[in-house]
């Protein structure tokens, strides 16, 4: 499978500005730490991490529409246009759709994204409280 990482990064930077891409970089760094001893699909996590907030960015944002729901729409459309395999697309969509969820039946990839997103939201003080 071909993941056009340059295009995804460019779209995240263009639409999400500095906050979007910096948020993604922090999440990927956190996932490297919290997922260190885990067996997970790094491609799914990489794509889901970049796309999980797309519905809240720039021209993709729709007032009154939850950013998670909108991200599912935007990311789904993008991945279909790019020809991602259905099982990969479904896995990424699960990660995006549950990144604010406490559903215990999520995949390890979805849990890693959700946990990293929560830790990033808490900030440094919040992270230090955990350890």
Indicate residue ranges for each PLM-predicted region.
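Divalent metal-dependent catalytic cores for phosphoryl transfer on phosphate-bearing substrates
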Residues: 38, 43-131
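Amphipathic alpha-helical segments within well-ordered protein domains
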Residues: 9, 28, 32, 72, ...
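Active-site flanking loop/helix segments enriched in acidic
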Residues: 2-31, 53-63
